[in-house]
Amino acid sequence: MSAHTSEVHVVKLGGSLLGWSETPHRLAELLSRASLTRPLLIVGGGRAADSVRDWQQIHRFDEATAHDLAVDAMTLNSQLLAAVVPQATLVGNRDEAATAWQQHRWPILDCAAFLPREEPLQPLELPHTWAATSDAIAAWVTLAWPASRLVLLKSTGLSDQIPASQLAAAGLIDHCLAGWLEELPTVDWVNLRAATLQPTRWHSRADQPVP
């Protein structure tokens, strides 16, 4: 197995968590654990993506344009995270991520750089609509990389009794992620605001060994 794929864990940080001063510290605490040797960070759009939604309502541009702007919002937030987490660094492809891991740094994937080159090569289509937000992008990257685990960092805890469709209806995940769940490997959910950073195992594919 190559250095690009060996035990890679996609770690998706909810964009709303950028508004919390403790996020850099809590994130570093989580990523320092031995079980996350090759984390690949993806940062959600948060308030920046919300601005895109507002602009679309005002200016009536199409879904594809909104998607592109929302991905650019993720890049803005990724740059912010790289600025406030000293061990993190922005990367645009697998080679740059591998270099970051070799340097004991935490790569943050610039999806605006990665997706246009990667999407034509992958069988799973990523919708360019609001049905596919940063949750879906993180899931898509997990499959495309491929990674052995997806870790969702959220502002709330998870009850394992709640089905994915209900979580999507409540706005806790997007509908694409809910629909792709059975295709994904291990998926963990972490409430980054909780007193104890304890991952909840949300999903394990039947034929996927738990790393």
Question: Where are these predicted regions, by residue range?
Answer:
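Nucleotide/pyrophosphate-binding catalytic subdomain
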Residues: M1-A206
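An anion/pyrophosphate-binding glycine-rich loop and adjacent beta-alpha core
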Residues: V210
